[in-house]
Amino acid sequence: MVEASNTKGTQKDGILATLEWQEDVAVVTIRRPQRRNAVNHATLMLLQEFQEEARGRARVLVLTGEGEGFCAGADLTGVEDEEFGSALSATLLGFTLLPCITLAAVHGYALGAGTQLAVACDLRVATPSSVFGIPAAKLGLAVDQWTIERVARECGGAIARNMLLGTSTYSGEQLHTQGAVHKLGVLSDALEWAHYLATLAPITIAAHKRGLEAVAEKIVNDAAFEALRAQAWASADAHEGRTAFLEKRKARFTGN
């Protein structure tokens, strides 16, 4: 595994999160283990900053948490702040809008905002014993419509209803059986997969990702998708992919 070449974090309120680079894989780690990686407004703003750094440079972004869990939810000392809700929504949407693959590496608790962050990512690797759930109804809170639609789409309607209405939790193994977790494993497994994914054609990935989001948004003939699709077909990577196939060798994609 390639060593991190660069690390960036913040000292405000202690280190809240870091961004490490392993070649063209960005590894974003929430670092509030004393709060079980519960996110506050400052953490969310930092995640948004990292999203922008990853845009145009990363082929894969891996999101994980330090210590014993992925993210135990929102830091309840500030969740009532209207700015927090706006920051959370922007952060979740930000992961879906990145052109690169986003991959959540989940262990321990992924509750509330933790589950929201996980389902906002394109792919999920989780340990069998990791715990997913949205216990908002136990707190008298309500998640936004985007989250409800995303959880229903990624986890299935029945599981979404049980999470949101019954406040039930699911293990990583249970969600893997249902297809909501794509692979069972630990962070090293997620990073190994990420480095493989980073070898795929980035323009194609961006087009397919936009197309998947357009399907989710029920957009037909989405102009942004069609533009990316045309770019993929006309790209040097497309020529390289076809040439490598004919020459029976591994393609070397440059993102051009």
Report residues per predicted region:
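Short helix- or helix-capping micro-motifs
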Residues: 73-74, 151, 159-168
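Glycine-rich beta-to-alpha active-site loop
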Residues: 94-140, 169
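Conserved CoA-thioester-binding segment of acyl-CoA-metabolizing enzymes
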Residues: 1-66
